[in-house]
Amino acid sequence: MGKEDIRSLIDELSSPLDLSNGSVGIILAAGHGKRIKSEKSKMLHEIWGVPTVVRVRAALDGGLDNSAQIVVVGIKAEEVAKSVGKDENLKFVVQEAQRGTGDAVKIAMEAIEGADFSGDVYIVPGDMGLIDEHTIKSFKESFETSKADMMVLTGEYAGDPENNQYGRIIRVPKNFNDGSPAGSLAGEVAEIREYKDILAMKDEEPYEVKHKGKIFVLNKQDMLNLSEFNTGVYAFKDGSLKEHLESLTTENVQGELYVTDLIKIFNENDKKVHAANANDSRLVEGFNLKSTLREMEAIARERVYEKLKDVITIEDRYDFFLSDEVVDRIFELDEAGKAGDIHVHKGVSLGPGVHLSEGVEICDHCQLTGTVYIGPGTNLGERVLISNFPGQEIKIGANTTILNGNEIKGEVKVGDN
């Protein structure tokens, strides 16, 4: 699509924003992710059957109580916007050139320029496929309680520091380099240093951190060894953000505008900066590599297993897929006392349109997609494939047995046995 076609699509998918509840969420979904080595947009890679950007949108929607949302698209704009889809209180904007996260935020803020809004702005990367509404809600509560002008959500990197490619949180140490105590300044977030900027330093090159009239010095290895990382999730008071966005510069190794530089800028202008640490750092990680994406998928599977392990029988905790919609329906059955005898064997995959009933057993490597209703007491043998197109339904009655290797497709009804 050409630029005009993309803008036309963006306008078509966008809706008017209602800013009355005091907050707006911005999703940064313009990047592509070269290191993922895929023609598909980074934002469209799936975690547990759902594109990451769609998961981020749902987390913001729940965590911010249905606040207005602005999605910044860029590379693969058409595919990303269509994946998110049209919805109330949702607007798309385009970052035509990849000039950094700071530029993306500036473009998003232009969408509410002139609007009667003086609330809070929340920013989340579009590739954070494990983040949930509870994490967003907790972050929002921390920000509102803190009375800060800006807050960053941080995580703790548990692996080898050499593999940590996140920006590092630089806090004021307890004692400065000359041994003098930092006093009340100790622990304050002084700035964020991006990973690529750290790598570009010479090994023993000193880096001076100036914070509220004090100076302390770190070198390259000091910063690489920091385990607290920037998740890319931020909260701002709208007025403070607007006031200082124009202060961002491209004086860094990537020649981009960094949102992270606002930490230092806010501190220099006597704005109150806080950080909140995520309860589970795994949920606030993004991805740049296929291996990381697989690790995130494994975490998503583990979370589903932990939810269901005492509700139904899952034969192999490492090899199954039950879509979020199926999980929700299982909990509905459980509330009615009808989920206990559901048995899911190794390698089973159940798509979002699958409806189970009490006493259903689904054997190894069955795959069910489309709209499918499985009656009570039914047994699906190994490698059964059931699928249909949109608008079609497959209904399998109670106490039915489908033998190994059978395929059922289309509009089908199998009566009770």
Segments (PLM) and residue ranges:
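A structural signal for short hydrophobic beta-strand segments in well-ordered beta-sheet cores
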Residues: 44, 168-171, 275
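Conserved N-terminal catalytic core of the sugar/cofactor nucleotidyltransferase
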Residues: 1-27, 50-141, 145
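Conserved adenylation A10 loop of the ANL superfamily
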Residues: 29-35
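Conserved catalytic-core motifs of eukaryotic protein kinase domains, centered on the activation segment
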Residues: 36-40
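Conserved beta-strand segments of alpha/beta enzyme cores
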Residues: 43, 89-91, 188-191, 272-274
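A residue-level structural signature of the nucleotidyltransferase/glycosyltransferase Rossmann-like core
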Residues: 121, 128, 233-234, 285
